[in-house]
Amino acid sequence: MKFKEQNKRKAITFSYDDGVTQDIRLIELLNKYGLKCTFNLNSELLGKPGILIRENQRISHYKVHPKDVKYIYDGHEVAVHTLTHPNLTTLDETEIIRQVEQDRMKLSELVGYEVVGMAYPCGGINNDDRVAEIIKNNTGVRYSRTITNTDSFEMQKNLYRFNPNVYHVLEYDRLMKMGEAFISLETETPQIFYIWGHSYEMDFQPDYWSKLEAFFALIGNKDDIFYGTNAEVLL
Protein backbone atom coordinates (compact mmCIF):
# COMPACT_ATOMS: atom_id res chain seq x y z
CA MET A 1 0.00 0.00 0.00
CA LYS A 2 1.65 3.17 -1.21
CA PHE A 3 -0.11 5.40 1.28
CA LYS A 4 1.56 3.56 4.16
CA GLU A 5 4.92 4.28 2.54
CA GLN A 6 4.01 7.98 2.75
CA ASN A 7 3.11 7.66 6.44
CA LYS A 8 -0.56 8.28 5.70
CA ARG A 9 -3.34 6.21 7.22
CA LYS A 10 -6.22 7.28 5.00
CA ALA A 11 -6.69 6.71 1.28
CA ILE A 12 -9.40 7.54 -1.26
CA THR A 13 -9.81 5.65 -4.51
CA PHE A 14 -12.36 5.49 -7.34
CA SER A 15 -13.48 2.77 -9.74
CA TYR A 16 -15.53 3.34 -12.90
CA ASP A 17 -16.76 0.68 -15.29
CA ASP A 18 -17.33 0.04 -19.00
CA GLY A 19 -14.86 2.41 -20.68
CA VAL A 20 -17.35 4.90 -22.11
CA THR A 21 -16.57 8.27 -23.69
CA GLN A 22 -17.94 10.16 -20.66
CA ASP A 23 -14.79 8.95 -18.89
CA ILE A 24 -12.93 11.77 -20.64
CA ARG A 25 -14.95 14.44 -18.85
CA LEU A 26 -14.70 12.50 -15.59
CA ILE A 27 -10.91 12.33 -15.84
CA GLU A 28 -10.73 16.10 -16.35
CA LEU A 29 -12.56 16.57 -13.04
CA LEU A 30 -10.51 13.93 -11.24
CA ASN A 31 -7.29 15.59 -12.37
CA LYS A 32 -8.57 19.03 -11.32
CA TYR A 33 -8.90 17.86 -7.71
CA GLY A 34 -5.86 15.58 -7.56
CA LEU A 35 -7.89 12.36 -7.47
CA LYS A 36 -7.05 8.95 -8.93
CA CYS A 37 -9.30 6.32 -10.47
CA THR A 38 -9.25 2.80 -11.86
CA PHE A 39 -11.19 2.27 -15.09
CA ASN A 40 -12.49 -1.22 -15.81
CA LEU A 41 -12.74 -2.03 -19.52
CA ASN A 42 -14.16 -4.79 -21.75
CA SER A 43 -11.53 -5.17 -24.46
CA GLU A 44 -13.84 -6.86 -27.00
CA LEU A 45 -16.43 -4.08 -26.68
CA LEU A 46 -14.05 -1.15 -27.16
CA GLY A 47 -14.99 1.18 -30.00
CA LYS A 48 -18.61 0.02 -30.14
CA PRO A 49 -21.50 2.50 -30.13
CA GLY A 50 -24.39 2.21 -27.73
CA ILE A 51 -27.45 3.99 -26.41
CA LEU A 52 -29.21 3.53 -23.07
CA ILE A 53 -32.84 4.51 -22.50
CA ARG A 54 -33.36 6.02 -19.06
CA GLU A 55 -36.74 7.58 -18.16
CA ASN A 56 -37.41 8.27 -21.86
CA GLN A 57 -33.93 9.81 -22.25
CA ARG A 58 -31.40 8.55 -24.77
CA ILE A 59 -28.03 8.35 -23.01
CA SER A 60 -24.81 7.83 -24.97
CA HIS A 61 -23.03 4.59 -24.10
CA TYR A 62 -20.25 4.75 -26.68
CA LYS A 63 -17.10 2.83 -25.78
CA VAL A 64 -13.69 4.44 -26.20
CA HIS A 65 -11.63 3.25 -29.17
CA PRO A 66 -8.79 0.77 -28.51
CA LYS A 67 -6.19 3.13 -29.98
CA ASP A 68 -7.25 5.87 -27.55
CA VAL A 69 -7.13 3.82 -24.35
CA LYS A 70 -3.51 4.53 -23.47
CA TYR A 71 -3.68 8.33 -23.62
CA ILE A 72 -7.24 8.75 -22.31
CA TYR A 73 -6.45 6.87 -19.11
CA ASP A 74 -2.88 8.11 -18.69
CA GLY A 75 -2.17 8.87 -15.04
CA HIS A 76 -4.89 6.52 -13.85
CA GLU A 77 -5.26 2.72 -13.89
CA VAL A 78 -6.87 0.42 -16.45
CA ALA A 79 -8.27 -2.86 -15.14
CA VAL A 80 -10.19 -5.95 -16.25
CA HIS A 81 -13.96 -5.99 -16.70
CA THR A 82 -13.92 -9.20 -18.81
CA LEU A 83 -13.98 -9.49 -22.59
CA THR A 84 -17.74 -9.14 -23.11
CA HIS A 85 -19.35 -8.30 -19.73
CA PRO A 86 -21.00 -11.65 -18.83
CA ASN A 87 -22.16 -12.71 -15.38
CA LEU A 88 -19.24 -14.90 -14.37
CA THR A 89 -21.29 -16.93 -11.88
CA THR A 90 -23.13 -18.53 -14.82
CA LEU A 91 -19.95 -19.68 -16.61
CA ASP A 92 -17.73 -22.74 -16.28
CA GLU A 93 -14.12 -22.50 -15.15
CA THR A 94 -12.61 -22.50 -18.64
CA GLU A 95 -14.79 -19.63 -19.83
CA ILE A 96 -14.22 -17.60 -16.65
CA ILE A 97 -10.48 -17.86 -17.15
CA ARG A 98 -10.79 -16.93 -20.83
CA GLN A 99 -13.01 -13.91 -20.14
CA VAL A 100 -10.71 -12.58 -17.43
CA GLU A 101 -7.19 -13.47 -18.54
CA GLN A 102 -7.61 -12.63 -22.22
CA ASP A 103 -9.12 -9.27 -21.27
CA ARG A 104 -6.20 -8.66 -18.93
CA MET A 105 -3.64 -9.51 -21.60
CA LYS A 106 -5.32 -7.40 -24.30
CA LEU A 107 -5.61 -4.40 -21.99
CA SER A 108 -2.00 -4.80 -20.87
CA GLU A 109 -0.94 -4.61 -24.50
CA LEU A 110 -3.01 -1.47 -25.06
CA VAL A 111 -1.68 0.45 -22.05
CA GLY A 112 1.90 -0.80 -22.05
CA TYR A 113 1.99 -2.10 -18.46
CA GLU A 114 0.77 -5.21 -16.69
CA VAL A 115 -2.90 -4.94 -15.77
CA VAL A 116 -3.52 -6.53 -12.36
CA GLY A 117 -6.92 -5.23 -11.22
CA MET A 118 -10.52 -6.11 -11.98
CA ALA A 119 -14.15 -5.25 -11.29
CA TYR A 120 -16.84 -7.91 -11.65
CA PRO A 121 -19.22 -7.22 -14.57
CA CYS A 122 -23.04 -7.29 -14.46
CA GLY A 123 -25.38 -6.22 -11.72
CA GLY A 124 -27.05 -8.32 -9.07
CA ILE A 125 -25.19 -11.36 -7.79
CA ASN A 126 -22.17 -11.12 -10.07
CA ASN A 127 -19.53 -12.95 -8.00
CA ASP A 128 -19.11 -15.77 -5.50
CA ASP A 129 -16.37 -17.76 -3.78
CA ARG A 130 -16.05 -20.18 -6.70
CA VAL A 131 -15.47 -17.43 -9.24
CA ALA A 132 -13.07 -15.57 -6.96
CA GLU A 133 -10.96 -18.68 -6.36
CA ILE A 134 -10.80 -19.46 -10.09
CA ILE A 135 -9.59 -15.93 -10.81
CA LYS A 136 -7.10 -15.97 -7.93
CA ASN A 137 -5.56 -19.31 -8.94
CA ASN A 138 -5.62 -19.07 -12.74
CA THR A 139 -5.10 -15.45 -13.82
CA GLY A 140 -2.77 -12.51 -13.26
CA VAL A 141 -5.49 -10.53 -11.48
CA ARG A 142 -4.52 -9.53 -7.93
CA TYR A 143 -7.74 -7.89 -6.73
CA SER A 144 -11.36 -7.61 -7.88
CA ARG A 145 -14.16 -5.27 -6.80
CA THR A 146 -17.77 -6.26 -6.16
CA ILE A 147 -20.85 -3.99 -6.19
CA THR A 148 -21.77 -4.72 -2.57
CA ASN A 149 -21.38 -1.52 -0.55
CA THR A 150 -19.99 -1.56 2.98
CA ASP A 151 -20.21 1.08 5.71
CA SER A 152 -16.72 0.26 6.93
CA PHE A 153 -13.51 2.02 5.87
CA GLU A 154 -11.38 -0.78 7.35
CA MET A 155 -8.92 -2.58 5.10
CA GLN A 156 -10.47 -5.84 3.90
CA LYS A 157 -8.67 -9.19 3.91
CA ASN A 158 -10.23 -10.67 0.77
CA LEU A 159 -8.98 -8.63 -2.19
CA TYR A 160 -10.73 -10.94 -4.67
CA ARG A 161 -14.15 -9.92 -3.35
CA PHE A 162 -13.36 -6.37 -2.29
CA ASN A 163 -16.44 -4.36 -1.34
CA PRO A 164 -16.69 -0.62 -2.15
CA ASN A 165 -18.35 2.01 0.03
CA VAL A 166 -20.75 3.96 -2.14
CA TYR A 167 -22.30 4.11 -5.62
CA HIS A 168 -21.22 7.71 -6.44
CA VAL A 169 -23.94 10.34 -7.14
CA LEU A 170 -26.69 7.76 -7.45
CA GLU A 171 -26.41 7.59 -3.65
CA TYR A 172 -25.63 11.28 -3.19
CA ASP A 173 -26.67 11.73 0.45
CA ARG A 174 -24.66 8.68 1.47
CA LEU A 175 -21.75 9.86 -0.68
CA MET A 176 -21.52 13.26 1.01
CA LYS A 177 -22.07 11.92 4.53
CA MET A 178 -19.37 9.31 4.10
CA GLY A 179 -17.05 11.89 2.57
CA GLU A 180 -17.48 14.22 5.53
CA ALA A 181 -17.02 11.35 7.97
CA PHE A 182 -13.84 10.20 6.25
CA ILE A 183 -12.31 13.66 6.20
CA SER A 184 -12.84 14.09 9.94
CA LEU A 185 -11.77 10.53 10.78
CA GLU A 186 -8.76 10.13 13.06
CA THR A 187 -7.19 6.68 12.93
CA GLU A 188 -4.09 4.69 13.80
CA THR A 189 -4.89 1.94 11.27
CA PRO A 190 -5.26 2.05 7.45
CA GLN A 191 -8.67 3.30 6.29
CA ILE A 192 -9.93 3.29 2.70
CA PHE A 193 -12.82 5.23 1.16
CA TYR A 194 -13.80 3.53 -2.10
CA ILE A 195 -16.28 5.08 -4.57
CA TRP A 196 -17.54 3.36 -7.73
CA GLY A 197 -19.91 3.95 -10.63
CA HIS A 198 -20.29 4.50 -14.37
CA SER A 199 -19.53 7.90 -15.89
CA TYR A 200 -22.46 7.68 -18.34
CA GLU A 201 -24.76 7.85 -15.30
CA MET A 202 -23.72 11.49 -14.90
CA ASP A 203 -25.92 12.21 -17.91
CA PHE A 204 -29.06 10.81 -16.24
CA GLN A 205 -29.84 14.13 -14.52
CA PRO A 206 -28.73 17.69 -15.43
CA ASP A 207 -27.16 18.30 -12.00
CA TYR A 208 -25.23 15.05 -11.59
CA TRP A 209 -21.96 16.39 -12.97
CA SER A 210 -22.09 19.44 -10.69
CA LYS A 211 -22.94 17.23 -7.70
CA LEU A 212 -19.98 15.01 -8.46
CA GLU A 213 -17.68 18.02 -8.69
CA ALA A 214 -18.98 19.30 -5.35
CA PHE A 215 -18.02 15.97 -3.83
CA PHE A 216 -14.58 16.12 -5.44
CA ALA A 217 -14.08 19.61 -4.03
CA LEU A 218 -15.05 18.34 -0.58
CA ILE A 219 -12.59 15.45 -0.48
CA GLY A 220 -9.73 16.63 -2.70
CA ASN A 221 -6.32 18.06 -1.82
CA LYS A 222 -6.18 17.01 1.83
CA ASP A 223 -2.66 16.68 3.25
CA ASP A 224 -3.47 13.67 5.43
CA ILE A 225 -5.13 11.64 2.65
CA PHE A 226 -3.46 9.54 -0.04
CA TYR A 227 -5.18 9.66 -3.44
CA GLY A 228 -4.39 6.61 -5.54
CA THR A 229 -5.65 4.10 -8.05
CA ASN A 230 -7.07 0.84 -6.74
CA ALA A 231 -3.74 -0.94 -7.23
CA GLU A 232 -1.82 1.82 -5.47
CA VAL A 233 -4.18 1.69 -2.50
CA LEU A 234 -4.84 -2.04 -2.18
CA LEU A 235 -1.58 -3.71 -3.17
Say what each PLM segment does.
Residues V20, V169-L185:
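A Trp-anchored, charged/polar loop motif used as the substrate-binding/catalytic surface
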Residues L26, D129-I134:
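Distinct, well-ordered alpha-helical segments
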